[in-house]
Structures are given as structure tokens and as C-alpha cells.
């Protein structure tokens, strides 16, 4: 018999504003404890050095976290010129120092070369796996593993400040982009070295930054809940964003109430859509009764919606 999870069956997404010097997993566990959630997962780790948007999926929302892992990201990064480190950030050991004789125009021209589809070699100090172990495991032992360059896209790279040996940039990029590697590559192209001194993620997909929640906000609300005996459902749960927001880039279809249970049990069912959608497309799937989100399906050759990720409802409604 499967062991029952402890905690509340709460579903939704919290846009956490991750603070400095805490790992993404530590941040996740703090959120999980605050909400007394039975299940939680994040959608792409931020380094301890990095701050900013970390979407935390609770409950059934964890089934759709991959869509946020695959989403575009936006960062504000401060690069320190003239120094190269082992990790390409402020936590690493200095391995090279050079004089900075870079003009603003040279910086602008260098940034232009990184825009669009490019190849990027991931840092050795990354969580990418080699023979089952993260690359940083080997890097800490002084072992260098050959890494293949990966396809990424830099949609925009804007210089917002250039003073002395510091550069602030806003980067809008595809999944799989390592900002530390981008800054290190920029430093090499400029001939003066560079590393990341500050990194803040402002957006995942098109989630607005003003919806982010800090730990201070959570702690204040928890104290209020305890002092005034307010249920968590009334004080914390309104902070959550609906789980279907993770897949809102997908087109949507609807099912009749008669088809709902069959769909939730894994059977392809007929669907209704106002738009023409190609076979093989992943779609958000709703019940026409109450516009309830049921999950993600794939449209098959029989003009049916075949379930791929379905929501398990703790209560029928």
C-alpha cells in the first residue's frame, strides 16, 4: 500500500522572490512548510548567489512544472570586468586578472554577437549530469569533463549601466541558458575577463515580477494567522496563482461533463474548440461545466483529446 503524504492537498503556484545565500531546494522546503503542503516542486534552480523569481508548484501543479522549466527567462545581471573565476561568479576562486580597456561601443558590439540562436558550452559548475553525477561534483575535484555546446537563444541583451569595471545587463533568453557562461564568454571576447557579481531573475514565461512573494511577507502572514486564528486557506492560499497558468501558452479545448471522468481516467475523448488546431498539438483541457482545468492533452488522429497530464481531484466538484 502506498504511504499517504502528510500535509494539505493544496494546488497552485507561488512566485517566490528567492533571497541571497539560500539554495533553491532550501527555499522550496520553506515554502512547503509554510503552506503545510503535501507536495511541492520548483521550476528551475537559481544559484545561491542569485535572487528573484522562483515559481514553486504545490500539489497537482507539480505535474505542469516542466512547462515552466522550458519557458523563457529574463535576468538582470551585474558583470565585473577584469577578473575571471573558477565558477564564473563571485563564489569562485580568481584564476585570471586583466586590465580593463573597454569602450562602451566595444561592449555594445560584443553583446550584439550573442543575440539570436547561439551555441553555449555549459559551465563545469552546473547541475548538468555526467554519468549520473552533476558536473560541479567533478569540478570540485579538479576534474574537467568535455561538454558539448548546446543550442540556446538570446532574445535580447540590453546594457543598462556601464561604469568603470561594472556592467549591468538585462537578458531575455531561452531555457538552458547559463548566465554565468554568457558573462564569461563575453569577458573572453572583450579580452578582459568577466564574472557575475549579481544575478536577479525578473521573469519566468510572462509571470509579472510584481506578483512575487518574499519570505518576509510569508512570515508576517503566518504570524497574523496565528495571532488572529485565521485559517491558512484564507491568508496564504490567495497568494497562489492557478496551476493552468503554467500552460497558458498552449491552445485550449473543452470537454463536456459526460466526457470528464473518462478523460481523468486516461481515455481519449471528443473535444470542442472554436479554433482549428493541428493533430499532435498539446492543449490545455477544460470542462465546459465551470471551466474547470482538467490537465494537458494531445489531439490525436481520431479528433480526440488524449490525456498527457491530468489533475487528480481530492474532492469531486
Swiss-Prot record:
Coiled coil: none annotated. The active site is at residue 47. Its EC number is 5.4.99.25. GO terms for molecular function: RNA binding; tRNA pseudouridine(55) synthase activity. GO terms for biological process: mRNA pseudouridine synthesis; tRNA pseudouridine synthesis. InterPro entries: PsdUridine_synth_cat_dom_sf, PsdUridine_synth_N, PUA-like_sf, PUA_sf, tRNA_psdUridine_synth_TruB, tRNA_sdUridine_synth_fam1_C, TruB_C. It comes from the Bacteria. Keywords: Isomerase, tRNA processing. Pfam families: TruB-C_2, TruB_C_2, TruB_N. The keyword Isomerase applies. It catalyses: uridine(55) in tRNA = pseudouridine(55) in tRNA. It is an enzyme of class 5 (isomerase). Belongs to the pseudouridine synthase TruB family. Type 1 subfamily. Responsible for synthesis of pseudouridine from uracil-55 in the psi GC loop of transfer RNAs. NCBIfam families: TruB (TIGR00431). PANTHER family: PSEUDOURIDYLATE SYNTHASE TRUB1, TRNA-PSEUDOURIDINE SYNTHASE. This is tRNA pseudouridine synthase B. It comes from Pseudoalteromonas atlantica (strain T6c / ATCC BAA-1087).
